[in-house]
A protein has these predicted regions:
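Primarily secretory-pathway and cell-envelope proteins
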Residues: 1-37, 60-138, 161-228
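A short beta-strand element within beta-rich, extracytoplasmic domains
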Residues: 3, 50-61, 151-162
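A glycine-anchored, Pro-Gly-centered beta-turn/N-cap motif
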Residues: 40-42, 46-54, 141-143, 147, ...
Length: 228
């Protein structure tokens, strides 16, 4: 049973039992549906990029971290134990994570070359909100760029255009920033090609650049496109 309290003539508290199905009716009014997506390197805000729900995650390709800003997830994903075999450490990473509730506003981050299948059966898809940003697309080459001076602060998708090198934010925040190697995934020798596939990415989703953040770009050219 559930109870509510009321004052009796302003002098005392009277506890009145009410029916236990009230909260159930409230919960049943929430619309949910099956939701699936593939997550690659980037940040994903629950309620904007993916819906609130209880998720399962499965590695599809590559290796990297899957973390959340609330501390509920902090895992290394390693598809088919590729990195584990390379460094000779058993159980270096995982390929699967189940029954993880994600609440509104949580930031989920995927790093490096990892591709993760994410899905839930109770996704509150109808509650997803757009960012509604009024930002411009911009191309940037080698150098240091400040949000607020060289481009507007906001959330951007990063696309590699040319070169091979590192891109990072300063100060670096794992929940909003970037520290990745971007470049071409082609090589002459098979061994070098395999190494490239484990290191280089060509896109990064939803990089959050706040006023005063510095974007450091080394030996590559990239494009910033406003995230939707």
């Amino acid at each position: 049973k559930y109870y509510s309290t009321h004052r009796n003539n302003g002098d005392s508290i009277v506890t009145i039992p009410i029916q236990g199905h009230v909260s159930e009716n409230i919960e049943s009014s929430i619309e949910t549906e099956v939701f699936t997506t593939t997550l690659t390197a980037g940040h994903y805000i629950v309620g904007i990029d993916i819906p609130v729900g209880t998720y399962s995650f499965f590695s599809k390709k590559g290796s990297g971290n899957l973390i959340s800003d609330d501390g509920s997830i902090n895992e290394i994903f390693d598809y088919e134990s590729q990195v584990s075999s390379d460094i000779g450490i058993e159980n270096f990473g995982t390929e699967e994570l189940n029954n993880i509730p994600l609440t509104d506003g949580t930031i989920l981050t995927v790093t490096s070359t990892q591709e993760i299948s994410a899905g839930c059966e109770d996704g509150r898809v109808s509650e997803l909100k757009p960012r509604n940003q009024e930002l411009n697309e911009i191309e940037l080459g080698y150098g240091l760029y400040a949000a607020g001076d060289d481009f507007d602060p906001g959330t951007y998708n990063v696309t590699w255009l040319e070169g091979n090198g590192n891109i990072q934010t300063n100060p670096y925040d794992s929940d909003t920033g970037i520290n990745e190697i971007m470049g071409e995934k082609t090589a002459t020798y098979d061994e070098l090609q395999e190494l490239n596939n484990k290191l280089y990415i060509r896109s990064f989703n939803n990089l959050i650049l706040n006023e005063g953040d510095i974007l450091e770009i080394n030996d590559i050219k990239i494009k910033l496109t406003p995230s939707k």
